[in-house]
Swiss-Prot record:
Gene Ontology cellular component list: cytoplasm
Protein name (Swiss-Prot/TrEMBL): 1-(5-phosphoribosyl)-5-[(5-phosphoribosylamino)methylideneamino] imidazole-4-carboxamide isomerase
Enzyme type, top EC level: isomerase
One Gene Ontology term from the biological process aspect of the record: L-histidine biosynthetic process
Top-level lineage group: Bacteria
Amino acid sequence: MLLIPAIDLKDGQCVRLKQGDMDQATVFSEDPAAMARHWVEQGARRLHLVDLNGAFAGKPRNEAAVKAILAEVGDEIPVQLGGGIRDLGTIERWLDDGLSYVIIGTAAVKDPGFLRDACTAFGGHIIVGLDAKDGKVATDGWSKLSGHEVVDLAKKYEDYGVEGIIYTDIGRDGMLQGINIDATVKLAQSVKIPVIASGGLSNLKDIDHLCAVEEHGVEGVICGRAIYSGDLNFKEAQALADKLGAA
């Protein structure tokens, strides 16, 4: 089970939001590259970046911070980025800059043809971000709810060659209320694409629960507020996941 620290970028700073609300941002660091270094030192094997301004604007907005992170740790571990990625040119630029994966969210829902083209052009580098509220997929920085069911959409993407799906339960994001295990497993069992859980990770019990369903295709979890607030010790959590995975 891969534990992936999240670095959410807003106006060049590392922040955490509650339920995707840009007005409820807590700044955790003004130096995202130093934060990236910290997580690598704590044993992170991959980093998850989100360009929050980009997600709302529909184009990259935190390039300087992302490039600083890549310069700091990009040669050591894979880095993935979501937010504002809506065209092939943007994907190409980010991969050239050193990202290992780009996460396509809104554009995958609104324009499946674009997702298919991206997978064809950049096979092995495309992850889909499906963000859901009560089973329905949200878009545009979570500000709009589509009529699509998560599982139905995921099944559509199966033959595109998507590298993974990050499934976020919006209602739990940043609330430290625990991962929505049932919904995550339901999705993972419905598709052959590896699923990464997100939204609500709060303590070691969640790690226990996730490792218990790893065999169903849940291969990782995004760690957000809990590792910043101190509710979860990242190093300890990854060690537990490794131990349970080896059992």
